[in-house]
């Protein structure tokens, strides 16, 4: 299977990446590769099933890290509420400023992301556990545990973090794959 851009990981960040890539590159052929049987499974468990999207109190003045550009990024990033409103999902804040979907159901967030990606023609390959990525003359060769072989000019890795491995993400996966790509494409 060939694609222009492969996005490894079909969670919230993988689906959002697909939507944003389509916005920036409307003609690009996109493929989301998800190791589980469906995209967005972990979204359903976030925020105790309500999916806490953001917080009204996010501000550069609350950032205390060492990255000096963070304030600029925070101040000029669209809010989660605006992003999801653009996807057709209404949000509401609770008394502590936490932003949830108006429905108070994480399934609404998954539906908004998945439907927008589908509306935009993003292809999704589920049940495909990526075992290797190799750099090639034309981009990348991606091998899956099920025998599927995918070639892509570009790859976005959005495989999730370490939290809640019972939902199919263990975090170690992304580091192993990135380490393999880096070691194969860069000389020490």
Give each language-model segment a name.
Residues 107-108, 116-188:
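Predominantly flavin-linked oxidoreductase catalytic cores and closely associated redox partners
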Residues 6, 22-48:
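Glycine-rich FAD pyrophosphate-binding loop
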Residues 68-78, 95-115, 125, 162-169:
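Short beta-strand to alpha-helix junction loop
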Residues 1-13, 31:
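Beta1/beta-strand and adjacent pyrophosphate-binding region of the FAD-binding site
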Residues 28-31, 91, 155, 181:
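Hydrophobic anchor at the start of a short beta-strand
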Residues 84, 113, 177:
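Residue-level signal for inorganic ion chemistry
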Residues 47-96:
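Glycine-rich active-site loop/strand segments that organize a redox cofactor
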Residues 19, 23, 115:
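Short, well-ordered alpha-helices that flank and scaffold nucleotide-derived cofactor binding pockets
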């Amino acid at each position: 299977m060939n694609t222009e851009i492969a996005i490894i990981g079909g969670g919230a960040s993988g689906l959002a990446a697909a939507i944003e890539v389509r916005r920036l590159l409307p003609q690009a052929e996109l493929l989301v590769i998800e190791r589980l049987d469906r995209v967005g499974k972990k979204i359903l468990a976030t925020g105790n099933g309500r999916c806490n999207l953001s917080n009204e109190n996010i501000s550069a003045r609350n950032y205390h890290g060492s990255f000096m550009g963070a304030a600029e990024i925070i101040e000029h990033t669209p809010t989660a509420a605006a992003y999801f409103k653009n996807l057709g999902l209404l949000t509401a804040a609770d008394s502590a400023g936490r932003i949830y979907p108006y429905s108070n159901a994480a399934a609404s967030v998954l539906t908004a992301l998945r439907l927008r990606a589908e509306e935009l023609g993003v292809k999704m390959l589920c049940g495909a556990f990526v075992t290797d990525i190799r750099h090639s003359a034309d981009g990348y060769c991606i091998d899956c545990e099920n025998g599927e072989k995918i070639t892509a000019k570009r790859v976005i890795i959005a495989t999730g973090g370490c939290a809640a491995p019972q939902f199919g993400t263990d975090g170690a996966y992304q580091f192993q794959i990135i380490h393999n790509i880096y070691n194969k494409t860069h000389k020490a």
